[in-house]
Amino acid sequence: MKDKQKKKKERTWAEAARLVLENYSDAPMTPKQILQVIEAEGLKEMRSGTSPLACLNAMLHSNSRGGEGLFYKLPGRISLFTLKKDALQWSRHPATVEGEEPEDTADVESCGSNEASTVSGENDVSLDETSSNASCSTESQSRPLSNPRDSYRASSQANKQKKKTGVMLPRVVLTPLKVNGAHVESASGFSGCHADGESGSPSSSSSGSLALGSAAIRGQAEVTQDPAPLLRGFRKPATGQMKRNRGEEIDFETPGSILVNTNLRALINSRTFHALPSHFQQQLLFLLPEVDRQVGTDGLLRLSSSALNNEFFTHAAQSWRERLADGEFTHEMQVRIRQEMEKEKKVEQWKEKFFEDYYGQKLGLTKEESLQQNVGQEEAEIKSGLCVPGESVRIQRGPATRQRDGHFKKRSRPDLRTRARRNLYKKQESEQAGVAKDAKSVASDVPLYKDGEAKTDPAGLSSPHLPGTSSAAPDLEGPEFPVESVASRIQAEPDNLARASASPDRIPSLPQETVDQEPKDQKRKSFEQAASASFPEKKPRLEDRQSFRNTIESVHTEKPQPTKEEPKVPPIRIQLSRIKPPWVVKGQPTYQICPRIIPTTESSCRGWTGARTLADIKARALQVRGARGHHCHREAATTAIGGGGGPGGGGGGATDEGGGRGSSSGDGGEACGHPEPRGGPSTPGKCTSDLQRTQLLPPYPLNGEHTQAGTAMSRARREDLPSLRKEESCLLQRATVGLTDGLGDASQLPVAPTGDQPCQALPLLSSQTSVAERLVEQPQLHPDVRTECESGTTSWESDDEEQGPTVPADNGPIPSLVGDDTLEKGTGQALDSHPTMKDPVNVTPSSTPESSPTDCLQNRAFDDELGLGGSCPPMRESDTRQENLKTKALVSNSSLHWIPIPSNDEVVKQPKPESREHIPSVEPQVGEEWEKAAPTPPALPGDLTAEEGLDPLDSLTSLWTVPSRGGSDSNGSYCQQVDIEKLKINGDSEALSPHGESTDTASDFEGHLTEDSSEADTREAAVTKGSSVDKDEKPNWNQSAPLSKVNGDMRLVTRTDGMVAPQSWVSRVCAVRQKIPDSLLLASTEYQPRAVCLSMPGSSVEATNPLVMQLLQGSLPLEKVLPPAHDDSMSESPQVPLTKDQSHGSLRMGSLHGLGKNSGMVDGSSPSSLRALKEPLLPDSCETGTGLARIEATQAPGAPQKNCKAVPSFDSLHPVTNPITSSRKLEEMDSKEQFSSFSCEDQKEVRAMSQDSNSNAAPGKSPGDLTTSRTPRFSSPNVISFGPEQTGRALGDQSNVTGQGKKLFGSGNVAATLQRPRPADPMPLPAEIPPVFPSGKLGPSTNSMSGGVQTPREDWAPKPHAFVGSVKNEKTFVGGPLKANAENRKATGHSPLELVGHLEGMPFVMDLPFWKLPREPGKGLSEPLEPSSLPSQLSIKQAFYGKLSKLQLSSTSFNYSSSSPTFPKGLAGSVVQLSHKANFGASHSASLSLQMFTDSSTVESISLQCACSLKAMIMCQGCGAFCHDDCIGPSKLCVLCLVVR
C-alpha cells in the first residue's frame, strides 16, 4: 500500500496520462477527461495550490511536440490527445484521410518542431498537406457537420503542429508547417481570405494577416467588382496551389469550415508566409496596409517585421474568421451582397458616370494637386457625404451596403468598426492630431454622416497611402460611402485613387502635409478613421466591412456616433438633450446624482451625467423611450429636476418611468396636473418610483445606502407594480417627494454645500461629513425623505410586501436597508436618529414605513390632489393601501405614520384606526421605543409639553402623531406612536410628524413649488381645494404647512444637522423632535432651517440670490442673514436660539423661528447659506414674516391662521423656509407667480403673512407658494384634489392646496397648532423640544420654526386634525374632516383615522405624499426636503438655472418636484403640470408635488438603476456641477455641458 502511495506521489503527469490513455481509454481524450480519470483512479497525487488541469495540459502539449513526445495531439481536434503509437490510426481516423498517418505524425512533429516541415520536401509538403488538407477538409466537411468546433479547435492546434498548417490553411499554420502544401494552402487560403477580407484589410489598413480577415471584407469589396469572385477570389488565387494540394477541399465559405476554428494568425506567420510561393506572397502583401509592407530594392513587396504580428492583422484574421463563422462568405450571402451592390450601383449609376479616382482627375489635375486642393473641399464634401472617392467606396458598398443595411452586419463589422476606430483614434491621436480632431470632431460634432465622412477622410487618406491596401481602402470607403458604389470604383486602383484623393480631401482638417505624411504613418489610422467616418456617415454598423481597423475606429466612433446621430445606446448626449426631462421624469439613476449637475433645465442631462454605465445607458434608453413621449414630462422633469433637483429627472423621470403613466401624468399632468393625477396617480406612482429611483439613488449615495435604496426601490418597485402604481405612486410619490425632496435635497442640498447641482450626489456624499452631515444630512434629510421616501417607499413597499410583520424588518431591515440605512443615513438618519432618539427600528419603521405609506398616501393624496378625481381612487387605493399600510401598520406604521400625516384625516382615520391601532401598539411601542430609545422622552416631555401644553396639540399630537406619525410619518403605529412620541417627545415632533410628515407631504407636494409651499401646497391643495375661504388660512396653512415643511425640513435639516441620525423625515419628525427638545429642536430646527435652506435652494431665488447661494454654499454665515430673521424670530427666538444653540438646529430653529431662513440656514453652513441666501431674499419678508409668523404663531397660533399660514412655529421653522420660502417662494412664487398671480400674490401675501407670521415663515413661503399653489390648486385641486385631499390632502393637501393645506401641517397644523397651539403654541414654542418637534414634525413648519412654533407645530400636529378641522373647516373638506380628524385625532385615534380614511380617501394620500413625504421624510419634501432638497434644488436651480427658469417657473414647482418627487408619477405629470400649473400656482403647486411624486416613482425606478450614485463624485469642468466620475466621464464634463456643447 505504501508502495502504491509512494508511486502515486512520484508519478509524473506524463506517466499518469500515459497510464490513462493506455489502460482507461482506447480513444483520444481531452486533458480534462484524462485528469478526471487520474483523479478518479488516484493515479497521481494532487498537491494543493497547483492547478492539475493546467499542469496536465502543459505536459500534454509539450509532450506532443517533439519526435520523442509520448503523446499525439489530434490535428483536427481542439485538444484530443492519444499516445503516439496510436496516433496514426486516430489521425487518419478522424480525418478519414488515408495516407495521412505519416503526414499526421509528420504534421504533429512538424508542428512540434517548426523546422521539420519547413524543410520537408515538396512531396512531403504535398503529402503532408494533402493529408492535412484532406484531413482538414474532410474534417471540416464531415466533422464540421457533426462537431466542427471540436475539429476546428483540434485542427487549429493540430494545425499548429503542421498538419493543420496544410489542412487548415488559416487554421493553425505552425511555423514549421509543411512549406509547400501547408503553406501553399495557407497562401491560397490567404489569398482567398484576403480576397474576401481585403476590404476588411484595407479598411483596417492593418496587416496582411488582417488582410486575411480583411480579405473577406476586401474580397467582398473587391468582389464588389465581382461579388461572386469574392469567394472565388480567394479561391482563385489559392486555386493554383490549392488545387495541387487539394486546396479546393478546404471550405472557405461556410460557417462549418474548419477555418472557423482556425487561428489565421497562427497559420500565417513570417515562416509560413515565406514558405509560400512568391506570387502568393505578393498577392497577400497587397492585402496588407501599406505601413505593413516594404518595397525591396528589387521592387518587390516585403513583409515588415510586425506586419503579421500586430493588432490590425490580428483583428483582420479574427474578423475574417468571424465573418466566415457568420456565413458572410457563403454563396447565398455573397449573392445577396452582390445584389445589394448592384442595387447600389443602379442607384448610384450617375456617380459611375462622373466617377473619378480622385477629385479633379477629369480636369487634368494630378493626384497630389487634387489632394492639396481638395483637402478643404473634400472635407466639405465629406461632410456632405458627396465625395467622389466616396463614390468609389460606394461601390464597395456592396459589403458596405449590407453592413449599412445591417443585414450583413456581422460581428466583424463591429469588430472592424472597433478596430478602425481604435486605429483611427490612435492615428488621429498621433499623426492626425489635427485630422483626428477634425475627423473626430466632425464625427462627433457632425451628424453621423459627417462623422462617417470625417472618418472616411482618414480612411481615404489611408487608402491612398495603401497602394497595396488600395482594395482595402476602397472597401473601407465602400462601407464608408456605400452611396458611392460604382463598378469602376470597385477597381482597387480607382478605389485607391478615389480614396487617396477623397481621403485626403476628406480629411480636410488634416493639413496637406499631414495628409501626405499620413499615407505612411497614418495610413492605418486614417484608414481607420475613414472606416469610422464611413460608419457614422452611413450607418454606425457600416464600418464593419471596413476592416478591423475601421472596426476599431468604429468602436470609438460609435460612441460619439450614437451621440451624434441616433441614440444607439441612447448616447448620453443625444438622449440628454432629447430625453432630459423624460429621464428626469423617469428618474433615471443616472440623473439621481447628476440632476444637480445639470444646471440646465434639462433634467435628463443632469441625470445622464449620473451614469454612463451600460446599465445606466440602458435604463436611460428605456426612460428616454418613455420620456420621449412626454415632453410635458420633460417639463415636469425639468421642474422636477428643478424641484427634484436631485432627481433632476425627478419630474421628467417620473413621467418617463410611468411611460404610459408618465404620459398620462405628462399629458394630464402637464395640461391638468390635478386631473392628470388620475393617470398621474399611477403615473405618479411609477414616476415617483422612477423619480425616487433617481432621487432615491442620490440619497443612497448620500446615504451610502444605494443598496438599500435599491432594495427599497426594488421593493417599492415590486410593491409598486403589484401594490398599485398608486401605491408606488404613493410610495413613489412620497419617494418622489422624498426623493425629489431628497434629490432636491441631495441636489439642492449638495448645491447648498457645493452650490453645484452635482453636489447633490457629491455634496450629499461629501456632505456626509460635517457638511455632509448637514448637507448630506440635508441630503440625508433629503435621503431622509428619500430614505423615508425611498426608504419609505422601499420601506413602504417593503411594508406592503412585509406588511405588518415587517414593520421592524421592513422598517428595520429593508427600510433599514433602504429605509433604515437610508433612513439611517438620510432617512436612516431620521431613522437612525429616530432610533437614536427613540428606536432604530421604530425609527426605521417610522422613517421607512412612515415614508412609504405616507408616500403612498401622499402619493395618493398628491395624485388625488393632482389627479383629484383620478387621484381619488388612487387615494382610495392609497386608502386601501393605507390599509395595507395599516396592515403593515407596523411596517406600514411608518407608512401609515406618513399616511396619516399626509392626511390628517386619513392619518387619524387610517393610522388612527389601523395606524392608530397599530400606532397604539406601535405608537406606544414605537413612541415608547422612541421615547425610550432616545432623549425622546426628554424631547417628549418638551414635545409632550408642547403637546400637552397644546392640549389639542397634545391630543392632536397624539392623534396627529398617531395619524401624523402613523399616517403622516407613514409609520402608522410606529410613526404615529413616534408621532405621538414625537409630539410628546418633541411636541413638535408629532406636530412635525403630521406637520412635518404631513407637511412633508405638503412639502413634498409643495416641494416643487416650495419646500414650504409644497407642504403648504399639499395642505394648500387640500385646503385650497377645500375652500377658497381658507385662503387666508391657506396662507396660514401654507405657512404652517410650509412651516411644517420647512420645520420638518428644517427640522430635518436641523435634525440632519443636529441629528445626523434622525435625519430622515421620520427621524426629523420623530428623531429630531424626539431626539431632544434641544437636539430635536436643534435637529428640527437645523433640519428645518436646512429644509428651509433646501427649500430655498429649491427656489429659484436661492439659485438667483447670491445671498442664498452664499448661504447655500455656507460662505455666508447663517447668522449674518439670521440676525434679521432672528429679530423676527427673536420672539420665538429665545427658544429657537436655545434650539439653535443646542445645535445648529436649535439656532436654526430659532433662526427658523426668528429667521425662517435663518433657521433654515442654521442647519448648516449650507443650510445657513441657504438660509442666508434666502434670508437676503426673504429676510425682510421672511424675517418679518418669520418673526411675525413666529410671533403670530407664538402669539396667536389660532390667529395666525392667516398668520397661521405662517403659523408662528411654521414660520419660525420656515423663516428659513420663509426666506427660502419667500425667496424660494419668491422665485417659486415668481415661477408660480408667473404661473399664477394669485399664486404669487397669495404666495407673497401668504408669504408676507407667513413671513409676517414668523410661525409660518415657511408657510409664508409655503403659503405664498401654497397659496400660489393653493389658489390654482384651490381651483383644480381644491375641488378635485381637495376633495380627496380635503380628506387626505385636507390635512396636508389642504395645507398644500390652501395656505392651510400645507398648514395641515403648516396651515392645518398651524390652524391646529394655531388653534391648539394658539394657546399652547407660544408655550410649546418656548418648549423648544416641543417646538422643535412641531417645528420639525408638525412644527417642521410651525414648531420647527421656533420653540413656540414648535408647540404650535405640535399643536398643529394635533391641530392639523383640528387644523384640518378648522382649516379644513375653513377649507371645506380638510377643515371638517381634518378638524374632525384633528379633533378626532386629538380626541381619538379613530377619528383621525376616519379623517385619515377621509384623507385617505383623497387628500390623505396626496397630503401624505406631499407634506408627509416632503415633510416627514424629505424635509417635508417640499420645504424641509427642499432644505435638503434646497441645496439640490439650488443646485438644480443653479445647475438647472436655465432650467430653473423653467423650473423657476415652477421654482415652486421645482421645489415641488424636489419635494414631491416622491409623489406620484403624476409628479412627472405634475412637474409638467407644475409647469402648467405653475401658471396657476396653486394648481401648479399641487401638480408639482404630484409630479414630484411621480418623479419619485421615477426616481425610485431610477434609484434602483443608478449605480453611479455610490461612486465618487467629481466636478464638471464646464459648469462646476458635481457628478459621479462615471457620469462625467473622461471629458470631465457633465451631461449637461456635453449636451450644451
Curated annotation (Swiss-Prot):
Widely expressed at low level. Expressed in heart, brain, skeletal muscle, placenta, pancreas, spleen, prostate, small intestine, colon, peripheral blood, leukocytes, bone marrow and fetal liver. Highly expressed in testes. Residues 243-246 are annotated as: Interaction with nucleosomal DNA forming a DNA clamp with BAP1. PROSITE patterns: DEUBAD, HTH_HARE. Residues 199-212, 844-854 have a biased composition (Low complexity). Keywords: Chromatin regulator, Craniosynostosis, Metal-binding, Nucleus, Phosphoprotein, Repressor, Transcription, Transcription regulation, Ubl conjugation, Ubl conjugation pathway, Zinc, Zinc-finger. Its main location: nucleus. GO terms for biological process: animal organ morphogenesis; bone marrow development; cell morphogenesis; chromatin organization; heart morphogenesis; hemopoiesis; homeostasis of number of cells; lung saccule development. Changing L267R: Reduced PR-DUB complex deubiquitination activity towards H2AK119ub1 substrates in the context of the nucleosome, but no disruption of PR-DUB nucleosome association. Residues 94-169, 193-212, 393-546, 637-719, 775-883, 902-950, 989-1044, 1125-1145, 1195-1304 are annotated as: Disordered. Ubiquitinated by TRIP12, leading to its subsequent degradation following binding of N(6)-methyladenine methylated DNA (6mA). The modification Phosphoserine is found at S501, S503. GO terms for cellular component: nucleoplasm; PR-DUB complex. GO terms for molecular function: chromatin binding; DNA binding; nuclear retinoic acid receptor binding; peroxisome proliferator activated receptor binding; transcription coactivator activity; zinc ion binding. Residues 517-527, 536-546, 906-920, 1005-1035, 1224-1233 have a biased composition (Basic and acidic residues). Residues 98-107 have a biased composition (Acidic residues). A zinc finger (PHD-type) spans 1503-1540. Core component of the polycomb repressive deubiquitinase (PR-DUB) complex, at least composed of BAP1, one of ASXL1, ASXL2 or (probably) ASXL3, and one of MBD5 or MBD6. Distinct combinations of ASXL and MBD proteins may preferentially bind specific histone modification marks. The PR-DUB core associates with a number of accessory proteins, including FOXK1, FOXK2, KDM1B, HCFC1 and OGT; KDM1B specifically associates with ASXL2 PR-DUB complexes. Interacts (via DEUBAD domain) with BAP1 (via ULD domain); the interaction is direct and forms a ubiquitin binding cleft. This is Polycomb group protein ASXL1.
